[in-house]
Amino acid sequence: MYFRTEAAIDLDAAEHNFNVTRAKLPENVKLLCVIKADAYGHGAVPLAKLFEGRADFYGVACIEEAIELKKAGIKTPVLILGAVPKEFYSDIVKYDIRVPIFNLEDAKALSAEAVKQNKTAPFHFCIDTGMSRIGFQVNKESADACLEITKLPNICLLYTSPSPRD
């Protein structure tokens, strides 16, 4: 006889863990719940519905995951945590999905799509603070590009790829 591995999700336990985490944070701190990869196999939509109105953002890995949440009626902002090819910007704007912006060219393309759809496309600046993985470098050229981006009709928030602790 063969046995399948199965993950049983206790939504009461998930809610308890969420509440404990939220209670430890200052009120002014925003909470982003990462539910990429179908919440690591636990069900992104059920967890998103459970935390709806209490989580400040949901983080996902790709456009398909973000659209799934939006089509399920999730109103909490959804942020894709990695780069999104420009060919998906139409859906990004259509479904009001937030994306990280890594350069001026992408910001201009996203802004143009938002203008085309007569909508605002919120995005997050991605600043590289030491890992040299993703984001604007901390230098004058990047500062100038970020300043130019702020003149586009679609600005929202800031996030970073922090340095690891040594």
Residue ranges of model-derived segments:
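Active-site-proximal beta-alpha core segment in soluble small-molecule metabolic enzymes
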Residues: T5-A8, A13-H16, V29-L158
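Glycine-rich phosphate/diphosphate-binding loops that line cofactor/substrate pockets in enzymes
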Residues: R22-E27
